């Protein structure tokens, strides 16, 4: 069974591992760098940019896969899924138009408005900097609301800036908005949104164009340093619970979040056609219930590393069910176990990360700790590993409870040597308790 995988990060390493649990799978991967974890699992690798559509076509024509799985968002944005489907290859990953739920923040917000989907917030879109943009921010200030500045296109999760975090106040938000236009960050179009106050969580679904099957809820930790301090990153780690909920998330709130995602899928279908792939909703649990911050048209990273290792159902079967519109024909189950994922990242990340420095990894010690190792932005050359400037590698602990899973992950992450750092508090009971207390305060 030939499977084409596009992507070379930790998320794709998790996808590759999950696929290879089926002994019939022969994996063929197109990726930019030599990720040693994915490389070891692949029959053949094409080293090309994941947005190089001609290279994707050439590799697919050569290997003739029976199914394709697209990991990152960038190939979706250039129509890789459209191309593969046109070639007659069943593909997991939405086509270019449905993928706009991630690639165009304006499309997403307008969809919520048009179809009256719950969980939306006050926003406005702008094509240039001027009095209208300034007036909208001034209006938010008069309402006592801080704002979030979001370049409308893809920025690899690095373009969004929030008042109270990267920005001092709404006046500084205006300065950053002007910079986005001056430098054409994310395509030179902007969404200004009200800043939500609450606790974040993520919810994933397998989507086959009509049906959505939900995965366990996960909490990511975007801040660089312990105690949720420092700049926003792509995610320093995450955890999930044995009951597939989260300690601060009631069943009622989880149900509301699921209904928002269900209506989103139906609305995408009506607007631009069927959505087939993984859908990841980033939510904020506020005093008014769950609000959607943004959607991603793929697995979250790090969340994929929490979810895929505890998937009991054959992942290849799930992928075919997604591509063929048959999710209602299979039973998808996850183990009732806790997971804790911790990332090791280059010193200086995400502002000014060191690059091309050697990273020593004691794989045996990580295995002895009963953790799973996932390689991310790593390049292997002459048997040595080098960090490339983004998140380097992650470890995942799995156990009957959060406390034990965290201990496994923590023991494992101490086995990296190089110019790197990590957060030691992810999955700890102290940090989780703070989340619970914060939600209690919101309810008052």
From Swiss-Prot:
Its cofactor is Mg(2+); Mn(2+). It catalyses: 5-phospho-beta-D-ribosylamine + glycine + ATP = N(1)-(5-phospho-beta-D-ribosyl)glycinamide + ADP + phosphate + H(+). GO terms for molecular function: ATP binding; metal ion binding; phosphoribosylamine-glycine ligase activity. The keyword Transmembrane does not apply. Keywords: ATP-binding, Ligase, Magnesium, Manganese, Metal-binding, Nucleotide-binding, Purine biosynthesis. PROSITE patterns: ATP_GRASP, GARS. Coiled coil: none annotated. Mn(2+) 1 binds at residues 282, 294. ATP binds at residues 140-202. Mn(2+) 2 binds at residues 294, 296. Binds 2 magnesium or manganese ions per subunit. Its EC number is 6.3.4.13. GO terms for biological process: 'de novo' IMP biosynthetic process; purine nucleobase biosynthetic process. Mg(2+) 2 binds at residues 294, 296. It holds the Pfam family GARS_C. The keyword Coiled coil does not apply. Belongs to the GARS family. This is Phosphoribosylamine--glycine ligase.
